[in-house]
Each structure stands twice: as structure tokens, then as C-alpha cells.
Amino acid sequence: IVMVNDPVRKDMYRKLVNAGAVGFISIAGSPLDEGVDLVPRAYALPKNLPGEEKKEAGREAVNYDNRIPGVSIHYKDAIELVTKGASQVCLSVEQEIVTRTSRNVVARIEGTDKAEEILTLTAHYDSVPEGPGAYDNMSGAAIIMELCRYFHAHRPRRTMEFIWFGAEEKGLLGSQNYIKIHENELSAHRFNMNVDLAGQLVGGTVAGVTGDASVCSILTYMAHEIGIGMSTKNQIWGSDSNTFAWKGIPAMTLNRDGFGMH
């Protein structure tokens, strides 16, 4: 059994399996936590069953001959295990395996003279166990809703879709489902603007662009013209904009960094 001082994701899981580990313990929390001995954690691992492979265009096939169990414990418990030199640990687990259905919500406003071209404004509405989700990401969902109200009253030239994605925190599942269902109209998509994290009074605004560097230049120019303090980064972004970029659609995530995420 291996104790790992990091979240166990795909690459680490592969190393553990290949090394012959029979299980793993990952560590969460901080020695500064007071009155806390539990920290909610959920990490997505490959869903492949033993002997199966999942192949997707542009993505690495993952195959495991066996599966190993793992558990996340608090930092303080990890220190106790190490200092006491524990060689055996009894772990009791009570859990229920459930399946849930997530949904996307789409509002479409037809354009006027360029209705055949589509712009998408998106935000995910799900959250994680660590917090109620006001910052991540009901703040973004609220911004998209207000923009939808505005453009409903002021018709845009291009068709606009306002999309609230579910299951983003589970691996961009909502946006991937949208792309799959709307595959035949993706050629009409011109740009995706995603909002993920907003509303921090003290912080910095970042536009994370996954697309041509010229998009960064245009956004920087526009922000300067209207007096918005904003930096741009040209990179892959860990949010639903990445799903659109994967299909060749220029995309960005508007992000307001601040203290803490949840």
C-alpha cells in the first residue's frame, strides 16, 4: 500500500498499478486546519473496466489489467500513521453507489442578418463537495443569465446560444455531451466565451484563450479600450471552453482569480 502526497490521477494511478501496488492512500488538508479531520475529496479515475480500452480521436487509449482501491485521508491522520510506524490499518467504508442524470440548459436567440453564424456563452452550474458553489460557479452562471436577458431585449446580429452545463466538475461531461449532440452544426460556430469563477472583490481578471494568438491580441485591445483591467493567457484551460477548442472553435474562459476557489 502506497501513501502519496498528491491527488492520484491517471498517470500516478498507472504508475501504482504497474509497480504492483495493492492500494493507495492520498493526503488532503493542511496541518493548519483546526477542528477538522475530514476533507471532502473526489478524484476521477479512468472508467475502463479490466481488459477494456477506450479510444477517442486525439486521446490516448488507457487500459488496465487490474484495479486497485484507494482512500483519501486528512494530513493529520497521515502524520499519525507515519510517526507511529503503522504497519496495519483497518479501514471501514460505508458507501452507496448511485447513478445520477445531469442536464444542460440551452437558451437560443436567433440573430438578425447573420443568423447562420453561432456564438456560445457558457457556464457550468454544478459544484464540488468542498463548498456550496457560489464562486465556482453560480457566479459565472448568473453572469450568463444576465447577458441572456440583455440580448433578448437587444437582438444580436449572429445567433447566440446561452448554455448552462451540468457535470463540468466530473470532467467537462456536460459540454462534451453538447458537442456530441450538435456535431452537425459545429462548422457554424464562430466563438465560445465561457465564464468560470467570478465576483471576487479583490483579485485579477484573466481571459484564458485556447485558440490563435490573435484572439488574445483582440481581447487585450478591447479591454484596454473600455477600461477593463484584464490579462490574457494563450493556453489550454481547464473548463468547458476546452471542449469547444478541441473541435477547432476559438474559445476563452473568463476567470476572476482571488483567494480560494470554494
Regions found by a protein language model. Give the residues of each.
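Non-catalytic positions within long, well-ordered alpha-helices that form the structural scaffold/packing
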Residues: V17-G20, H152, A245
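Soluble metallo-hydrolase cores and metallopeptidase-like ectodomains found primarily
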Residues: L49-A134, E146-A153, R157-T159, K180
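Solvent-exposed loop/turn segments at secondary-structure junctions
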Residues: P7-K10, G29-D33, D77-A78, E96-T99, ...
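Metal-dependent peptidase/peptidase-like ectodomains
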Residues: E53-A61, I68-G70, A78-I79, R155-P156, ...
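A fold-wide structural signal in alpha/beta-hydrolase
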Residues: I1, V22, I144, T159-E161, ...
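Second-shell loop/turn segments in exported
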Residues: M3-P7, M12-Y13, N66-V71, V93-Q95, ...
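Extracellular/luminal Protease-associated
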Residues: I1-A61, P132, M230
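Short, conserved micro-motifs enriched in small and acidic residues
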Residues: E130-A142, E169
